[in-house]
Every structure is written in C-alpha cells, then in structure tokens.
Curated annotation (Swiss-Prot):
SUPFAM superfamilies found in the cross-reference section: RbsD-like
Subcellular location: Cytoplasm
Stated role: Catalyzes the interconversion of beta-pyran and beta-furan forms of D-ribose.
Entry's transmembrane regions: none
InterPro entries in UniProt: D-ribose_pyranase, RbsD-like_sf, RbsD_FucU
Catalysed reactions, as listed in the record: beta-D-ribopyranose = beta-D-ribofuranose
Assigned protein family: Belongs to the RbsD / FucU family. RbsD subfamily.
UniProt name for this protein: D-ribose pyranase
Top-level division of the source organism's lineage: Bacteria
Gene source species: Maridesulfovibrio salexigens (strain ATCC 14822 / DSM 2638 / NCIMB 8403 / VKM B-1763) (Desulfovibrio salexigens)
Binding residues annotated for substrate, in chain numbering: 28, 106, 128-130
Subunit structure: Homodecamer.
The encoding gene: rbsD
Recorded metabolic or biological pathway in which this protein acts: Carbohydrate metabolism; D-ribose degradation; D-ribose 5-phosphate from beta-D-ribopyranose: step 1/2
C-alpha cells in the first residue's frame, strides 16, 4: 500500500504517463466528459472530494507547463477562483517558477477537454470549478 502522496492508483498512473504538454482536467460534478476521454470519477457526494483538495493532490505529483481555466470562473464563482489562484501562487513560489494561467470561454474550455488524457470528476458543486493542467518536464 502506498503511504504518501496521491493514493488513487488510476490518477497516479495517468500522471506518471503524461508527456510534455499532455493535458489532465480536474472538474466539478457537472462538467460533461467527452466520449473517448478517460474518466476518473472520484465524486462521492456533494463536496466530497472538493475541487481544491484534488487540485492540491495533483500538484503534489505533476510537473506543470501551464493551466487553463474558464473566464466565467472569475465572475460566477469568484471565491473558489480566488482560492484556486492562491493555491497556484503558493505552488509557483515553492517551485521557484511561474505557472501561467490561460483563460478561455467556457464553451471553448469544454471543447478543449476532448484533448485531455483523462478528466478527474470531483464532488464539487461550484459552477465553473474546472482546471486543465498542461504537463511540463522536470528538466
């Protein structure tokens, strides 16, 4: 049994297989998951697990190039958006490098998820609480 870090075997395996610029999406309970994209469904009930908790777990193991968010997230769910930005800023400081944040319209965000290697569904009930991580390289 794994003792630390990311305990979900499917998610840990997907992250270990990512190459430079591969995409991994973490989403709220309502984001449609395109046919053909692997679904890792962690949702148990409302808020369990939370979007932020899953984001933090992914950040423990994934090297990042950038992230993508929906523009609407800033206005519709500003508290959760600000919490996420704070997490990303802390992670950026720990890594000693910027994590660029790209914003797109939600309709385009959903279209872009078709390119994700996998989509991780959380129990989050906050509108637009979705993020796509673009994999970086460790060297």
């Amino acid at each position: 049994m794994k003792r630390t870090g990311l305990l979900n075997s499917e998610l840990s395996y997907i992250i270990s297989k990512l190459g430079h610029f591969d995409a991994l999406t973490v989403c709220d309970a309502g984001l449609p998951i395109p046919e053909g994209v692997q679904r890792i469904d962690l949702a148990v009930s409302e808020g369990i697990p939370s979007f932020i908790d899953v984001v933090k777990a992914v950040l423990m193991e994934m090297e990042l190039e950038s992230v993508e968010l929906a523009e609407e997230f800033k206005d519709v769910s500003s508290d959760r958006h600000d919490e996420l930005i704070s997490v990303l800023e802390m992670e950026s400081a720990q890594r000693g490098k910027d994590i660029p944040v790209d914003y797109v319209r939600h309709v385009n965000f959903k279209l872009n998820t078709k390119k994700s290697v996998a989509i991780v569904r959380t129990g989050e009930f906050t509108p637009y609480a979705n993020i796509t991580f673009k994999a970086g390289v460790v060297f």
